[in-house]
């Protein structure tokens, strides 16, 4: 689908800038939320992701499938690539991925393969989520790595953002 001539949907949401003093799960999820707003403003599905290691954000991305015409350009995949470059290794031991929606099968597999310590997501996805939603790749007994999972961090604002985007998108199409 050609998206170059389509008008982008105005985003009615504002970015949130939490205090830098407390760098907890909510702090990092707000960063991912702000990236999801950036995605919306670029007419992409509003999903954002950041990767934290040692209290610092080493990667930050949002969906870019339409802009890049690449079906793998999900926020999580892009952030994993950035993080691997930042640390100089594909193993992201000790790092945490924060993402505004539960990862799909592709992204869930990539998070496991990258050896992240944790994944924190806001909105569960019972249709395509693979870290506890539709299925749970993390619970495969034969896997040689398992993630710590935290669900529902800032679920309400992230869900409101996704719902509003798709409601406006359907109305515009």
Task: Give the positions of each predicted feature.
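Zinc-dependent deaminase
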Residues: 1-39, 103-173
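Immediate flanking context of iron-sulfur cluster ligation sites
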Residues: 89-102
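A short, polar/charged loop-to-alpha-helix boundary motif
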Residues: 67-77
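Residues that line or immediately flank small-molecule/substrate-binding pockets and catalytic motifs
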Residues: 65, 99, 123
